């Protein structure tokens, strides 16, 4: 099978420290002898990590399910809107040939504003 990937090695580190009789928090506090920090047991630390993973998965599942519900609702509204637009006339006016009287009318109005 080969050696585990580097990310898996970090997951085994707390287990190895616990088997060795040293919790991960105690290993860090040994580096700072003046620190009077309360130690966290490995069970509490594992509970925090697992709880975080479970909550993250629940949030992802909720976002996914809500996303599917919203897209279904929009799909039906778009379908009826497209059918309604097909039944009515086009909102655009068709182009007609050049009409010089429109432009000549604009030129006469411009003289009044000068």
UniProtKB/Swiss-Prot annotation:
Major localization listed first in the record, in broad terms: membrane
Transmembrane segments: 43-63
A GO term, aspect molecular function: protein-macromolecule adaptor activity
Membrane topology label: Single-pass type I membrane protein
Composition bias, Polar residues: 105-114
Places the protein is found: Cell membrane
Residue ranges of every copy of the ITAM domain listed in the record: 81-109
Region Disordered: start-end pairs: 72-114
Keywords annotated in UniProt: Calcium, Cell membrane, Disulfide bond, Immunity, Membrane, Metal-binding, Phosphoprotein, Signal, Transmembrane, Transmembrane helix
Residue intervals annotated with topology Extracellular: 28-42
Superkingdom field: Eukaryota
GO biological process assignments: actin cytoskeleton organization; amyloid-beta clearance; apoptotic cell clearance; cellular response to amyloid-beta; forebrain development; integrin-mediated signaling pathway; macrophage activation involved in immune response; microglial cell activation involved in immune response
Residue positions binding Ca(2+): 52
Post-translational modification: Following ligand binding by associated receptors, tyrosine phosphorylated in the ITAM domain which leads to activation of additional tyrosine kinases and subsequent cell activation.
PANTHER family with a match to the protein in the record: TYRO PROTEIN TYROSINE KINASE-BINDING PROTEIN (PTHR17554:SF2)
Assembly information from the UniProt record: Homodimer; disulfide-linked. Homotrimer; disulfide-linked. Homotetramer; disulfide-linked. Homotrimers and homotetramers form when low levels of partner receptors are available and is competitive with assembly with interacting receptors. They may represent alternative oligomerization states or may be intermediates in the receptor assembly process. Binding of a metal cation aids in homooligomerization through coordination of the metal ion by the subunits of the oligomer. Interacts with TREM1. Interacts with TREM2. Interacts with CLECSF5. Interacts with CD300LB and CD300C2.
UniProt similarity note: Belongs to the TYROBP family.
Name of the protein: TYRO protein tyrosine kinase-binding protein
Higher taxonomy: Eukaryota, Metazoa, Chordata, Craniata, Vertebrata
Gene: Tyrobp
């Amino acid at each position: 099978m080969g050696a585990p990937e580097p990310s898996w090695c970090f997951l085994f580190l707390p287990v190895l420290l616990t088997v060795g009789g040293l919790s991960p928090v105690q290993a860090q506090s040994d580096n700072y002898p003046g620190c009077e920090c309360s130690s966290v047991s490995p069970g509490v630390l594992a509970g925090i990590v697992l709880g975080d993973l479970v909550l993250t998965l629940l949030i992802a599942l909720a976002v996914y399910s809500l996303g599917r519900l919203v897209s279904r609702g929009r799909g039906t509204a778009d379908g009826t809107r497209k059918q309604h637009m097909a039944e009515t006339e086009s909102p655009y006016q068709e182009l007609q040939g050049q009409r010089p009287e429109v432009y000549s009318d604009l030129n006469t109005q411009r003289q009044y504003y000068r």
